[in-house]
Amino acid sequence: MKLTSLTTAFCLLSLPAVAQDHMTLMLDWFVNPDHGPIVIAQEKGYFAAVDLEVEIIAPADPSDPPKMVAAGQADLAISYQPQLHLQIHEGLPLQRVGTLVATPLNCLLVLDDGPIKTPADLAGRKVGFSVGGVEEAVLDAILRHNGLSLDDIELVNVNWSLSPALMSGQVDAVIGAFRNFELNQMDIEGVPGHCFYVEEEGLPAYDELIYVANPNTMDRDMITRFFAATEKATQYIVNHPQDSWEVFAASAPELQDELNARAWADTVPRFALRPTAMDYGRYAEFETFLHTAGLIPNLNEVSVIATDVTVP
């Protein structure tokens, strides 16, 4: 998700009524509707109810949170399943311990009234991206699913300016846009977009946003309590989407705008109802996808990549 309308640092602290265990959670970006269960758990007192004082920190650099967890500088970080596979192969001691958003959000984004009606129309066109590696593999899979390859298009690094690059005509499409944000952002700005969903264009389904911990140092009991609180928060969100939006928006003035209201409505159905539960096949399939794409040298066992912390 690439937005610039909010501040890049945001911290919420619960006030302990009794002696509580302190936990540090690094977000993947500034606070936004993707983080709904976390903010609701904080605002509704669900963390305090399980004796946790959770410090929620947004990073100055979105690439830092997994590294900080690996280095023992944070207990948990929000990250992305595709990146986790690569980071483990790079030697970072990380493991998925929970899921926040249980579906892909990534999409191939084009102008709704533009010339790209199917991904096959990208032949000879420019496609913007912000992060190499996984996004290139995702794009390659989409192109091959539609009879093309990366050789048929021109890749343009637009950094984090995905929708601006598309709306300005710098590129004909962008990969890495989040369907719950960029589509709404473009519509609000009067330039409607259209998403080709990666899971419908040749990609295996995956968990977009996950929680990662250091398997060598993590406190399983504390993390289990954290997920008990966020699961309760997710149930509240699903049962009371409007009331929960009001609680979420009231937590910070920056959240009280049309973009976040729209994104909230689009994100609610995608939150993991059982954050600790995991699909072993999903992680095995994506590991195989990355290996086939040549991004990893060998296949790790799923037990290395992910775990259910509630299982003894």
Feature names for model-found ranges:
Residues 284-312:
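Conserved C-terminal helix/tail region of periplasmic/extracytoplasmic solute-binding proteins
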Residues 21-158, 163-164, 168, 172-180, ...:
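Short, glycine-/small- and polar/acidic-enriched structural segments
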Residues 46-49, 145-150, 189-191, 221, ...:
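Short helix-capping segments at alpha-helix termini
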Residues 1-9:
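Sec-dependent signal peptide recognition
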Residues 219-295:
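Secondary-structure end/capping motifs
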Residues 100-110, 191-215, 227, 265-267, ...:
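Periplasmic-binding protein-like
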Residues 82, 161-251:
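Pocket-lining segment of extracytoplasmic ligand-binding domains
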Residues 14-16:
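N-terminal signal peptide c-region/cleavage motif recognized by signal peptidases
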